Design a protein with these regions (language model features):
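Acidic/His- and Gly-rich active-site-bordering loop/insert found
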Residues: 2-95, 104, 112-123
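Cytochrome P450 heme-iron axial ligand motif
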Residues: 107
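Acidic, glycine-rich active-site loops and adjacent beta-strand->loop/helix elements
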Residues: 73, 126-131
């Protein structure tokens, strides 16, 4: 499984940097949610869009018990001053606390550690479900 995670490391970096370059404030994560949904759908994941406005819920497995794994995707109203190629392109908004990495980590979990060995259901959901 570690080998599989390493094999997609470069793609995960591309996704995280894309999320970092295009941060969106809470309840406005339309681009981020669309991108997350697009990636999940490419891997055949059943999902629900627009949960709590811009949330995404990925359904993995079936039955009971149900485990929900939440991943934040909102950014903060801060100006990024980092001088990196993937700096925020949205003035006054940036990912300053790691939320740009939460969904790529969830994607690693989905792609490298399938829910097939789990006797129930595992949902990955966005931060809107806590609000």
């Amino acid at each position: 499984m570690l080998d599989k995670a390493k094999s997609i490391q470069d793609q995960l970096s591309v996704w995280r940097r894309d999320f970092h370059m295009h941060p969106e404030l809470g309840f406005r994560e339309t681009r981020t949610a669309a991108k997350v949904a697009e990636i999940l759908e490419q891997f055949g994941v059943r999902l629900r869009r627009g949960v709590g406005r811009t949330g995404v819920v990925a359904d993995l497995g079936s039955g009971k018990p149900l485990i929900a794994i939440r991943a934040d995707m909102d950014a903060l109203p801060l100006q990024e001053t980092n001088q990196v190629p993937y700096a925020s392109q949205n003035p006054g908004v940036m990912h300053a606390c790691g939320h740009d990495g939460h969904w790529p980590w969830r994607l690693v979990r989905r792609l490298c550690y399938p829910a097939k060995n789990f006797p129930g259901r595992c949902d990955s959901c966005s931060s809107l479900l806590k609000k």
